[in-house]
Amino acid sequence: MNNYISGATTAIITPFKNGTLDEATYANLIQRQIDNNIDAICPVGTTGESATLSHDEHKRCIEIAVEVCKGSNAKVLAGAGSNATHEAIDIAKHAEACGVDALFSVSPYYNKPSQEGLYQHYKAIASAVEVPFMLYNVPGRTGVDILPDTVKRLFDDVWNIMGIKEATGSIERTVELLAKVPDLYVFSGDDSIDFPILASGGKGITSVTANLLPDMKADLTHAALRGDFKTSKAINDELFEINKVLFCESNPIPIKAAMYIAGLIDTLEYRLPLVPPSSENMKKIENVMKKYKIVGA
């Protein structure tokens, strides 16, 4: 399999209007990413509020992403996660039928499977499709960590498992993964450490901040992948403050607020139990956007 995704990918938000998916705005957001050299769109992940979307909404988000990206250089790396394996398989099969380029799947949350359970879960989902497949490890949100030995076992045993989005916040984890699985495609899942992960051998990033600043995230990633670490680090350093502010509350609360302030979405709507930022944090977001001279701030 030689059609792996690498580079800068965006964990796209899901805009709502009057409680429903705002399809027109969603399509516009994706097109903006394409216009700013993002390599792939990642719909219906954590940032896309997948946990509170209906299955029909989840599938529609993927359909729109494929429609908008068709004919462009941008690929679709779609979310197919669930803590019920059969549901994840259903989503994955639908996404494949829509024409996505690859899939990522968050580790099962709440039910906390063992490493053997994680192995069987991912083996079942990836084996149900024939597109490249990425694990998504974010133990701070799911309560379970996909350990490197389990990643290696999956990589060795399942032909289309090609990588992992690593959101442990640990650079050492990336180093360990690549020591054990040199051909693994590791993607940074933490905006503040994109450069260190790329410099350690990572093949890409999946960014929240790219919703707002896709051009800078694309430049950071592409510089690192061509070996221009000086440029990549300089951009990573420049983005450090806004990266931190955009995680002042649970993702995607701050990034959606920032997108609203910037005029990129029409309404600031979340699905309960998520609610808008506190007034104190909203002020932080407004201030950092002014500092970065982002339109609308």
Swiss-Prot record:
Keywords attached to this entry: Amino-acid biosynthesis, Cytoplasm, Diaminopimelate biosynthesis, Lyase, Lysine biosynthesis, Schiff base
Subcellular location, principal: cytoplasm
GO molecular function: 4-hydroxy-tetrahydrodipicolinate synthase activity
Cellular component terms per the entry's GO annotation: cytosol
Pathway linked to the protein: Amino-acid biosynthesis; L-lysine biosynthesis via DAP pathway; (S)-tetrahydrodipicolinate from L-aspartate: step 3/4
Family, per entry: Belongs to the DapA family.
Provenance organism: Sulfurovum sp. (strain NBC37-1)
Catalytic residues in the record: Y136 (proton donor/acceptor), K165 (schiff-base intermediate with substrate)
Domain of life: Bacteria
Annotated catalysed reactions: L-aspartate 4-semialdehyde + pyruvate = (2S,4S)-4-hydroxy-2,3,4,5-tetrahydrodipicolinate + H2O + H(+)
Residues bound to pyruvate: T47, T206
Name of this protein: 4-hydroxy-tetrahydrodipicolinate synthase
Complexes and interactors: Homotetramer; dimer of dimers.
Record function comment: Catalyzes the condensation of (S)-aspartate-beta-semialdehyde [(S)-ASA] and pyruvate to 4-hydroxy-tetrahydrodipicolinate (HTPA).
GO biological process per UniProt: diaminopimelate biosynthetic process; lysine biosynthetic process via diaminopimelate
InterPro entries, sorted: Aldolase_TIM (IPR013785), DapA (IPR005263), DapA-like (IPR002220), Schiff_base-form_aldolases_AS (IPR020625)
The protein's Enzyme Commission number: 4.3.3.7
Subcellular location per the Swiss-Prot or TrEMBL entry: Cytoplasm
Feature type site, description Part of a proton relay during catalysis: T46, Y110
Class of the enzyme per the UniProt entry, highest EC level: lyase
Name of encoding gene: dapA
